[in-house]
């Protein structure tokens, strides 16, 4: 009798587990640099199919960069996008990036200057590289580089646009991000 109960329990658990496994969401990552990560995170989290955006650093050689003057070395501020490819495609994400950065400025973005604020799109596969190259606007100076180690920034900078919305809005406005994007995109 005990063996039959164990078998029944095992069969029920196996059935439940197999049903749960079939509903697991597939997640992919996409990383890009577009100036201040507070802004890139805010612009990208609103997209359907994006489940999370993590602010951080990538694209350099400095080990363990930190958000302190001189401590992020040769890295760029970046956004790592976690998304469901069944809802949003890599191609749509790349189109979004080109629409929300100044793709004509390789020396920084908007009021922020220097390599740490310069734009870049990072790819994992040749297919991703080809998509990013094909979608690049005619005057784009945005480098398309192989993905490298991504270092998340401290928690206080994650979701900054939600946690410190007034400071974020002031920064974004005073930096001229939206007015430049409107001019660049013909709005």
Tell me what each language-model feature is.
Residues 24-187:
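Flexible coil/turn and secondary-structure edge motifs
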Residues 2-10:
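Bacterial N-terminal signal peptides that target proteins for export
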Residues 10-19:
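Bacterial N-terminal signal peptides
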Residues 1, 20-23:
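Low-complexity intrinsically disordered segments
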